[in-house]
A protein has these predicted regions:
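Short, charged, surface-exposed secondary-structure boundary motifs
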Residues: 49, 126-131, 226-228
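Metallo-beta-lactamase
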Residues: 61-71, 165-178, 185-187, 192-285
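Conserved beta-strand hairpin/beta-sheet module of binuclear metal-dependent hydrolase folds
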Residues: 26-88, 208-224
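Divalent metal-coordination and catalytic microenvironments
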Residues: 35, 55, 65, 97, ...
Length: 357
């Protein structure tokens, strides 16, 4: 249904309503709200897709997110531009954040249509920094970080070999951008969209809220079925992204009307934002309780995976799982509930503090 009202294909799942029916195939689009087209591009990952959106903008379109830099994604855009987008020009490209599945083709699209790129400052600058790592040697600080987490020499060697891979998934970024900040209002076509900033999954994530009819482009800040990765990385080993994430979720729950129609980057558009935000918050609180039980015995970051993840952690997701484990450990440390001691081999062993026992 065009306005997010439940139609014959609508279904309910865990307190959320999905009104929009089956997702579009690559190159196709579904009108999910007035002036909003939902499209989908494949990802060569276990999370096998990203949703991208086109917003009617006068005689053209504003795009929100772009997919990875792959031939399949480019073909999907070519088909969409010639098909549901009607051959109209792209006037602006907005990226919710700097992860490659979101910015991968931003530069390609901006150059093709001479369109400006709109992002928050921290996301743009972080993307440029990570792209610049391509071809550079892996820093020793990263090896120290992962050894402290409990990685083996072999795992650290593989990390060194793959270092700088971010740039391979991202087309060259525009050398200039337009900054988006909290509470900015963008005029897109006949509509005003308010910028809402989230934190935790990334430094300065942009969401877009059309307050007139309650349409909310959530990016990765609110997903219907999975919780976005929240990780500490070697560049900021003492960071507290989980604290930022939880504070953002609490603030969004207090701010957003319960009847919003949420258009996420993964999964399907849904109603039930308050229910979903509460579930995300509760999920991390439950994980922290399991983690505290694990820390009754000294543990490395890699030892706490079973407390946080339902499935075994393979090498393909080891860095993300490690980052998320350290995010939870750092959070407990800031709360005075956990401490760490580094042994002579450079490995951190985490335990509960006396106050938390």
């Amino acid at each position: 249904m065009a306005d997010g009202v439940a139609g014959p294909d609508a279904r309910m799942e865990r307190g959320l309503t999905y009104p929009s029916g089956p997702p579009p195939e690559p190159g196709q689009a579904v009108a999910v709200a007035p002036g909003v087209l939902w499209m989908r591009l494949p990802l060569p990952l276990s999370l096998n897709h990203i949703n991208v959106y086109a917003l009617a903008d006068g005689d053209g379109w504003t795009l929100v997110d772009t997919g990875l830099k792959t031939g399949v994604s480019k073909a999907g855009w070519d088909a969409a531009l010639a098909g549901p987008l009607g051959g109209k020009p792209i006037k602006r490209v907005i990226c919710t954040h700097m992860h490659p599945d979101h910015i991968g083709l931003a530069g390609w699209l901006c150059e093709r249509f001479q369109a400006p790129l709109l992002m928050s400052r921290l996301e743009y600058v972080t993307a440029r920094m990570l792209i610049a790592d391509e071809g550079q040697p892996a820093p020793d600080a990263g090896a120290v970080f992962y050894r402290a987490a409990g990685w083996s020499d072999e795992q650290i060697a593989r990390w060194r070999t793959g270092y700088g891979g971010f740039g391979k998934a991202v087309a060259a970024m525009p050398a200039a951008y337009q900054r988006l900040s909290e509470n900015d209002v963008l005029r897109i076509g006949d509509d005003d969209w308010r910028v809402v900033i989230g934190e935790g999954h990334c430094p300065e994530h942009v969401c877009l809220w059309r307050e007139g009819d309650g349409v909310f482009l959530s990016g990765d800040q609110i997903l219907p079925r999975i919780s976005s990765n929240v990780s500490v990385w070697p560049t900021e080993p003492e960071g507290d992204p989980l604290g930022e994430w939880l504070r953002s979720l609490v603030a969004l729950k207090a701010r957003l009307p319960s009847d919003l129609f949420v258009l996420p980057s993964h999964g399907e558009p849904f109603h039930g934002v308050a229910t979903r935000l509460e579930a995300l918050i509760r999920g991390h609180e439950t994980a922290l309780k399991r983690l505290e039980r694990t820390l009754r015995a000294p543990s490395r970051a890699v030892d706490v995976f079973p407390a946080l993840f339902a499935r075994p952690v393979g090498d393909e997701v080891l860095s993300m799982a490690t980052g998320e484990a350290i995010a939870h450990l750092n959070y407990l440390a800031r709360e005075g509930r956990a401490r760490r001691d580094r042994d002579e081999a450079g490995v951190d062993w985490w335990t509960l503090t006396e106050a938390a026992k």
